[in-house]
Design a protein with these regions (language model features):
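Alpha-helical transmembrane segments and immediately membrane-proximal extracytoplasmic
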Residues: 1-329
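Conserved small/polar residues in nucleotide/adenosyl-binding loops
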Residues: 330-337
């Protein structure tokens, strides 16, 4: 493990909190929403933290001390590591409070190596269209029947089979593990690429504390992205969403070790799903989609607009950090100059 300075630690802590507050809500949001009144929060915390520890330890031991699952190979640790690199996670926190489904991959990783922005964009766009196509095809060809049934059962106040509890926990565990494989790079990019056992244990504890806080708070502003979609607070619908989302991340994870924006995958899946449900709904005389949040264009457009703002902010920060860093290095005396003086 290389030398660690205070800015690396601050950056890691801010990233751990901001990435968990933003990205993981897109992954655990359906789980948190549907279990809010059904499962004790302590049990939820134990389940999520257990999956987290398993994935972290697997990545650590299988990749020779690299908990990011090899996704930082093309993102070297900057030398020197200054305070400017803590700007991205602070920006993530600000955008999260606004309720923007910002891509932490763009905002954080591109700041470390702006040359990779194009590849990040291409990888994320392919993930978006993959998820959009899966949502459109899956719900358009058959899953709309489940959503119509769920909507009508909910309106009638009928309960559901307990088997759905087990199915949802399985799908959530699968999705959460795939998200960790993809997005741990956004957190560990602030630390040396190889960690020793003790620092790794501390990092794991920090992440688990953040996840417990997430569950205790019951979500955040990003939950609005979910609430505007059909049946997303229903355990049965959430189970299917989690499974489809996990499949997309699983496919992308083993197709390439290069990072992508899981946020865009999430938005693509929900967008394709909502369009398919609205199209099928036109064949019937009654509605079975969420109309409280406005028409389809407003819902999808709002998500894409906020995501676009996040990308613009990401690019501004990523392209601005390197000149700022160069300026600071130019005006600051080197260690050799300080010794001479």
């Amino acid at each position: 493990m290389g030398d660690v300075n205070i800015w690396m630690i601050v950056g890691f802590l801010l990233a751990a909190y901001s990435v968990v507050a933003n990205d993981s809500l897109q992954t655990l949001g359906t789980y948190i929403s549907s279990n809010k009144t059904r499962t004790p929060k302590v049990v939820q915390m134990g389940f999520i933290c257990s999956v987290t520890v398993i994935v972290l330890m697997l990545g650590f031991f299988l990749n020779d001390g690299d908990p990011a699952w090899g996704r930082l190979e093309k993102f070297e640790l900057p030398e020197p590591f200054g305070w400017v690199y803590v700007i991205p996670p602070i920006a993530v926190l600000a955008l999260t409070q606004w309720g923007a489904p910002v891509s932490t991959s763009f905002l954080v990783l591109s700041s470390f190596k702006a040359a990779n922005i194009g590849k990040l964009l291409g990888s994320s766009l392919s993930g978006y269209f993959l998820a959009f196509a899966l949502g459109l095809a899956g719900y358009g060809l058959g899953m709309w029947l489940l959503e119509r049934w769920v909507f009508r059962r909910t309106q009638e106040g009928k309960d559901f089979n307990r088997v759905w509890y087990g199915l949802q926990w399985v799908s959530t565990g699968f999705l959460w593990s795939m998200w960790l494989v993809q997005d741990l790079a956004n957190i560990f990019v602030f630390l040396p690429r190889k960690l020793d056992v003790f620092p790794m244990a501390i990092c794991t504890a920090v992440l688990c504390v953040g996840l417990c806080f997430l569950v205790a708070s019951g979500g955040g502003p990003i939950q609005a992205v979910l609430r505007s979609k059909t049946n997303t607070s229903d355990l049965r619908s959430a189970t299917v969403i989690d499974f489809f989302f996990g499949l997309c991340l699983f496919y992308k994870a083993f197709l390439s070790t290069f990072p992508l924006s899981t946020t865009w995958v999430f938005l693509g899946l929900l967008g394709g799903r909502e369009i398919a449900l609205r199209i099928k709904e036109q064949e019937f005389e009654y509605t079975f989609t969420n109309r409280e949040s406005g028409n389809l264009g407003k819902i999808i457009g709002s998500d894409l607009w906020k995501a676009f703002i996040g990308v613009v902010v990401s690019l501004v920060i990523a392209l601005g950090i390197q000149p700022l860093l160069s300026c600071l290095l130019y005006t600051s005396p080197s260690p050799r100059d300080r010794q001479k003086s």
